[in-house]
Amino acid sequence: MESALPAAGFLYWVGAGTVAYLALRISYSLFTALRVWGVGNEAGVGPGLGEWAVVTGGTDGIGKSYAEELAKRGMKVVLISRSQDKLDQVSSEIKEKFKVETRTIAVDFTLEDIYDKIKTGLAGLEIGILVNNVGMSYEYPEYFLDVPDLDNVIKKMININILSVCKMTQLVLPGMVERSKGAILNISSGSGMFPVPLLTIYSATKTFVDFFSQCLHEEYRSKGIFVQSVLPYFVATKLAKIRKPTLDKPTPETFVKSAIKTVGLQSRTNGYLIHVLMGWIISNLPSWIYLKIAMNMNKATRVHYLKKIKKN
């Protein structure tokens, strides 16, 4: 009987310690959620980081919404995209609506010999924020060897989704380091958090963006540079082929308004509270269950797309 008492006391303290630990974890999570999603970092994102914001893929979707949000905060904006007509249109809209200076650089990010032109276009600008947004996905989910024009898709997707992030960072980061301030926002994807079969190349390139961002943040945070990996799930954009926004598929404007609050607070973010919850659920699933669900969903999307093409 006496020997059981110390054991009971030990178990009591183990239990009490576990409860206290869990209570602290929950309290910290709630505090962090309130700080990020309730208060945010509104004041920290703007001309205080530098006069200019540079946005790649800035004429549509998430990129355009970042450009507008940063212009709204008083930043001058450089838009970089492929179509000069679209660039002129969006540039004029931003200039007229937000009364800020804008510039445009027309390049095709599928090519590799564009960066001297971009370097010339950015020369002499005090760049406070770089948004590496330009991206490319599959036309539809497909098995790797059956992707139409596979050689070309591999080259284009690597150039757009990976090379552009590295080269744009190489161009802009030195000026930020020199001034000891700046932010680089790299738009990855929820597909970069976990493997997505039938979107294999896209998923892998977005994982690169996520890891590149995390590493770069650790390398340069002590120099005053904030690097963020943004990992959205579905947003109602042309790239995602979603026309009608819903609670879990927000408009680009809604997503960016939420995501920009996390700059300076989270170096890795889903950007939107519903997407955070989705990421938490997926991360707690056994990998075999998640992969089975992802595979079945994309197989169904593939079949639907191919049937539609066949009808047309």
UniProtKB/Swiss-Prot annotation:
The chain crosses the membrane at residues 4-24, 182-202, 271-291. Keywords: Endoplasmic reticulum, Lipid biosynthesis, Lipid metabolism, Membrane, NADP, Oxidoreductase, Steroid biosynthesis, Transmembrane, Transmembrane helix. Substrate binds at S189. Its EC number is 1.1.1.330, 1.1.1.62. One of its GO terms (cellular component) is endoplasmic reticulum membrane. Pathway: Lipid metabolism; fatty acid biosynthesis; Steroid biosynthesis; estrogen biosynthesis. The active site is at Y202. It is a multi-pass membrane protein. NADP(+) binds at residues 50-79. The keyword Oxidoreductase applies. It is found in: Endoplasmic reticulum membrane. GO terms for molecular function: estradiol 17-beta-dehydrogenase [NAD(P)+] activity; very-long-chain 3-oxoacyl-CoA reductase activity. It is an enzyme of class 1 (oxidoreductase). It catalyses: a very-long-chain (3R)-3-hydroxyacyl-CoA + NADP(+) = a very-long-chain 3-oxoacyl-CoA + NADPH + H(+); 17beta-estradiol + NAD(+) = estrone + NADH + H(+); 17beta-estradiol + NADP(+) = estrone + NADPH + H(+); 3-oxooctadecanoyl-CoA + NADPH + H(+) = (3R)-hydroxyoctadecanoyl-CoA + NADP(+). One of its GO terms (biological process) is estrogen biosynthetic process. A motif (Di-lysine motif) lies at residues 308-312. The keyword Transmembrane helix applies. Belongs to the short-chain dehydrogenases/reductases (SDR) family. 17-beta-HSD 3 subfamily. Catalyzes the second of the four reactions of the long-chain fatty acids elongation cycle. This endoplasmic reticulum-bound enzymatic process, allows the addition of two carbons to the chain of long- and very long-chain fatty acids/VLCFAs per cycle. This enzyme has a 3-ketoacyl-CoA reductase activity, reducing 3-ketoacyl-CoA to 3-hydroxyacyl-CoA, within each cycle of fatty acid elongation. Thereby, it may participate in the production of VLCFAs of different chain lengths that are involved in multiple biological processes as precursors of membrane lipids and lipid mediators. The di-lysine motif confers endoplasmic reticulum localization for type I membrane proteins. This is Very-long-chain 3-oxoacyl-CoA reductase.
